[in-house]
UniProtKB/Swiss-Prot annotation:
The keyword Iron applies. InterPro entries: Dihydropteroate_synth-like_sf (IPR011005), IspG_bac (IPR016425), IspG_bac-typ (IPR004588), NO2/SO3_Rdtase_4Fe4S_sf (IPR045854). Its cofactor is [4Fe-4S] cluster. The keyword Ubl conjugation does not apply. It comes from Campylobacter jejuni subsp. jejuni serotype O:23/36 (strain 81-176). [4Fe-4S] cluster binds at C264, C267, C299, E306. Keywords: 4Fe-4S, Iron, Iron-sulfur, Isoprene biosynthesis, Metal-binding, Oxidoreductase. Binds 1 [4Fe-4S] cluster. GO terms for biological process: isopentenyl diphosphate biosynthetic process, methylerythritol 4-phosphate pathway; terpenoid biosynthetic process. This is 4-hydroxy-3-methylbut-2-en-1-yl diphosphate synthase (flavodoxin).
Length: 357
């Protein structure tokens, strides 16, 4: 299936381009209190090494805002401030931050929005209109309830507000906690504007539930060419958010990066400790950013066939096995030696590609 992405306007968050032909960026949000400068920077650095492109932080009051200024000066990643209720915090943070997210449901009057727009325009930073089904403006929830219709009305109303103020550095999110409603919201808004979309399922839950919901919603939208930046929301799992997001991009065929591991589900034919092997391989290869297909198979039934399509593969047998690279057997070893040799071949494959580039 040919992937064709919806062409959107391009904006910039720090040094990261969003929309247009730019790669789809991956975001996360800290769960520290922003006034905890050391703790916040520690989480930002973890996200940086995990492969995040952009980080968002909550700002509840001026103590957070002042801390955010110091955090921004030391951050390796662009930062977005997440504002609810108090528009003055957005105005203050616009002086040094890379982007502002406002919630139309609680930011207040048109005058409040006008002040935020003025501050962001002066700095040349974008605003995300973050529509959330749980906090729709009363004028729309009274008329439409808390469903997709109300979200669409809110989005279009706030887009027009910003456009009437001659502001167009906009991105939009349409988040619900339900995968189907999230898909519907983004699909229905897409023909109505050409601003970049930030994809996400809000309040998606813990690792298991979030992975399922986000894979369904975000994967579905990405395959339809919808989405310019994304977050996999996950309760308390910073690095996993990035890992799952990158996996969704890779397995949907939208953006190749990192290791794609092919491994069998195991059955009665297995005569080796495949589960231990795959855990080691997964842990030892998670740092790799180069697109790489590797195969770890437990018996000969499908192992050789899978190996033909893999860059590096293991085919386990009884107490021994094969290490295969680009379809060619490079070693036949006893089981205790297989994983180490396999990982050495993986690292050599990565290095050889770097030399060619």
């Amino acid at each position: 299936m040919e992937y064709k992405r919806f062409k959107t306007r391009q904006i910039k968050v720090g040094n990261v381009l969003i929309g247009g032909d730019a790669p789809i960026s991956v975001q996360s949000m800290l769960f520290t209190k922003t006034r905890d400068i050391e703790g916040s920077l520690e989480q930002i650095n973890r996200l940086y090494f995990a492969g995040a492109n952009i980080v968002r932080l909550a700002c509840l009051d001026m103590a957070d805002a002042r801390a955010l200024k110091e955090i921004k000066a030391k951050s390796p990643l662009p930062l977005i401030v997440d504002i609810h209720f108090n528009h003055n915090l957005a105005v203050y943070c616009a002086e040094f931050i890379d982007g502002v997210r406002i919630n139309p449901g609680n930011i207040g009057s048109k005058e409040n929005i006008k002040e935020v727009v003025k501050a962001c325009k002066e700095r040349g930073i974008p605003i995300r209109i973050g529509v959330n089904h749980g906090s729709i403006e009363k004028q729309f929830s009274d008329k439409f309830g808390y469903g997709v219709d109300a979200m669409l009305e809110s989005a279009m109303y706030n887009i027009k507000l910003l456009e009437d103020l001659d502001f167009f550095d906009i991105k939009i999110s349409m988040k619900t906690s339900d995968a189907q409603k999230t898909i519907e919201a983004y699909e229905r808004l897409r023909p109505l504007c050409d601003y970049p979309f930030h994809l996400g399922v809000t309040e998606a839950g813990t690792k298991f539930h979030s992975t399922v919901k986000s894979s369904i919603a975000l994967g579905n939208l990405l395959l339809k060419g919808i989405g310019d930046t994304m977050r996999v929301s996950m309760t308390g799992e910073l690095e996993e958010e990035i890992r799952v997001a990158r996996a969704i991009l890779q397995d949907s065929g939208v953006q190749k990066s990192g290791v794609n591991i092919i491994s069998c589900p195991t059955c009665g034919r297995i005569q080796s400790d495949l589960l231990s092997a795959i855990k080691i391989v997964e842990e030892k290869t998670k740092h790799i950013k180069e697109p790489l297909n590797i195969s770890v198979m437990g018996c000969v039934v499908n192992a050789l066939g899978e190996a033909k399509g893999a860059d590096v593969a293991i085919a386990f047998g009884k107490n021994q096995g094969l290490v295969i690279r680009h379809g060619e057997v490079v070693a036949k070893l006893k089981e205790s030696e297989l994983v180490d040799r396999f990982l050495a071949e993986v690292e050599d494959e990565v290095k050889s590609r770097a030399v060619k580039e």
